[in-house]
Amino acid sequence: MKVRGTVVGEVTMRTVSTSAGERELAEVPVRLADGTTAADGSADGTATHDHDTDAATSTRSAVEADRPDVDATTVTLWGKWTESADVLEPGMELVVTEAERDEFRGETQYATTTDSYVVVEPSYLVDVTDVRNWVQCPRLYYLNKLSGVPLNYPVVTGTLVHEVFGDLLRGRDLDASIDERIEERALELGLLGESAESAAEDVRQNAAAIEGWLEQGRLSEEDDWRSEQLLISETFGLKGRADAIRRGAPVELKTGKNLRKEPRFKDKVQAALYALVLEEHGGSIDTGTLLYTKNSALDRNEETGDLTPAKDFSMGRGLLEYVLRLRNEIAAMEASGTVPTGKEADAKCEYCFERDTCMVVSGRLDQESKAGQVGQALPEAELDHFERFYRAIEEERREVHREYGKLWEQTPEERADDDRAIVDLEFVEARELDGGRWELRARRGSSGTAKFREGDLVLASDGEPVGGDAELARIERLDEDVVLTADEPVEVARIDIYPSELTTDRLLVALHDALLKGDERRKDILFERAEPEFESLDETFVGNNAAQDEAVRKAVGARDCALIHGPPGTGKTYTIARSVDAMVERGERILLSAFTNRAVDNALEALLDAGIDPDRIARVGTESGVRSDLQHLRLEREGDPDERVRALEDAQIVAATTATCGSRIMKEQSFDVALVDEAAQLTEPGTYAAINLAERFVLVGDHHQLPPVVQAENELVESLFERLVETYPDAGVMLDRQYRMNQRIQAFPSREFYDGRLRPATPAVASRTLDDLDGVSRSALPADRRDPVTFVDVPGDGERHTDAEEAARIADLIETYEAAGLDREDIGVIAPFRAQVSEIERRVPADVTVDTVDRFQGSSQEVIVVSFVASGDLDGPIFEDYRRINVGLTRPKRALVLVGDAEALESDPVYRRMLDWARS
Ligand SMILES: Nc1ncnc2c1ncn2[C@@H]1O[C@H](COP(=O)(O)OP(=O)(O)OP(=O)(O)O)[C@@H](O)[C@H]1O
């Protein structure tokens, strides 16, 4: 049976005499999660898919851990498992598989058996490659998290060899694969100063060994290969991508040589972890294979040793248990928030390539380390900042892991309802593409409103995203059909949101770079030790708008930073374009960034409108990320390395999302100034990713609109923009003339959110109404809809996340506006919950945009209808936070209709004032 629970007290270690001699044991007081005491019926004793344990097991709180352990049970861990007991602390979660139950002095107890596995913090999904680092030295694991994978030649060739390996498994020709893969990485090779020819030669040397080996057992039927498999383990708390699976067993590829008979230990560890996951999903693995690509390329006269590239090893039970204990050490360290010192392992610092980095990081962050420290520790405030944000980012990582957890905790229907999956796909075909990848096509059973977008990376599966045939795939098209591209021909029946840790990984690196590599002057600003300085400029940049003019002057003249606060429709994008134009004139190199691709593209469009030469611009992003009409600005990565690198380095303006700013390629670039739009939607470390690359920075945003998108409630919710606007009011300018809304529409948001400072930019803006639109006449509307702002009282139907009555009234309203001559494309409907969005979508024509506020930020419409879904006594603001309602109310240009239950809305002071305005 499987036992799962929370550790509620100190662990007792003992040695006892048994018939088999002296044995170690650890007694762990555990409060069992609901349902675990029931005898486990499943044959393999692992899967207890119990949804109810969620709340009890996923949140560890001090309160829980401190509760008197009246209902605690003793779980005894025998033998080597005492090593895992050693890392346990109260509050941590514990799982024992195949445990035995025992009655002892009238109490039920549990103990490990010879078939048991012990898992610490199973909901923390440790990455398999992280365990490989950890086994070399725990400190190496930590350093890798902080500094990420740099752009260097071994990393790039390693990736290329892996890609070619995958291609060979898919039956591609070696030369064709090498040529194509090298071409795809032209930009990276160019940045490293490598030629395509020499890189191809290096890859070929490595790949020849693989090819030779594959030839021997040539991809026969019974060999049953597949390349790259995403593996996730619910029981063992592991995830990773195995290089290949052959006859159900893991094969790992290592670019390098190994002349011993046995695989390297750390490589075995990695393969063994994949084997554990494969066993969980029903496999039975007795061997693992490591493939050392350099072995057969060696000159046989010079080297002696075992030259076979492929080395098999037997996957003993002892090894599997050992690697799981390693995994447990990582999970426990992350849960307790400690930093490894390197003393945990017996690695020799003298031989370590990372020794210098290790010493510098220890010195700067004042951490104990086996290698010793060099350099001066950061000031107290910076150390504190680092620790707080490190913890906050790790909390965010746990939220990502929780998303993984939902893959097995939720039923397919629940996931579909939550917009986390499309589950009713009917597989149509898998078509092989040039280059060995696959195009997968499936038909949708219903038109759900899942959050998926074209270009998203998703988990495509045969219906079982964990344990079944699943692969990462990219959405190429999404209408009544779903078209995906993937490495494997999965018979796709379902797609799920892929919980990526890339963002969290990059946040940590950005934090590290900002504090440890950051310019001192910038840190003085970030740590509020110095006032930002400005060069005084006499030029006029914008003749018809004083605030914009001042903003451009600040942006251009900033020696450290400038902050442009732009309420809705006040010409943020216009001001950015003017600023960039002026910076280009001065010969500066500019990084133009924003949280979303959409905002980056909007800014670029404005630059083109302002007459900036497109040849000066390089847009860094994927093909699906960049708007189709701006593809000509996109930096091509494929081709000739020299040409590609010149295209990037000669570009005076480089535009990319902040996430992309953290990529290996962008991290090699430097700029005079970084200009970041949507800065109020970025976390602090998210903003660092862009500003780390430049001498000075300009942040543009509005902290009264949407806050940073984060799952955890912690430091990350306040943007750097907001913090700096408050700290340095003199470095900021608020744009106060809006070019969007009729005066009536603007009145309430201006008063409520901008101290009444927002005004129409021109009389024409102030007086715009629907009558200005071709073929539209307000007189054709019912009298109570003619005002630019109106309210429709619909008593709520009592449901929490939907309101069918409101949805029906909205459908009627849309007909009314259409009858008055309005195009359906000019109407937008905003609802607070996805469920209500679906409810409304079912009733209105498809060309009316219906969405949540988050999707509307940054856009505008002629007419906006807001559905409030408010009922009862409003136990919290409906749009979660007033910033969301501000966004909702400021989208329309000419008409705004609020639909909701007046009585419920009036119970909240802000909504009451809103109703007073709408009804006045
Ligand atoms: N100084 C100006 N003179 C004339 N037109 C302007 C000026 N500033 C902005 N505009 C116009 O006002 C409109 C809104 O400007 P812009 O798109 O820059 O606003 P924004 O603040 O970026 O909007 P959002 O709040 O949606 O991000 C655009 O059509 C723009 O051309």
Locate the predicted segments by residue.
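Mg2+/Mn2+-dependent nuclease catalytic core
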Residues: 35-37, 62-90, 224-325, 449-452
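OB-fold and OB-like beta-barrel modules that bind single-stranded nucleic acids
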Residues: 2-13, 87-103, 108-115, 456-462
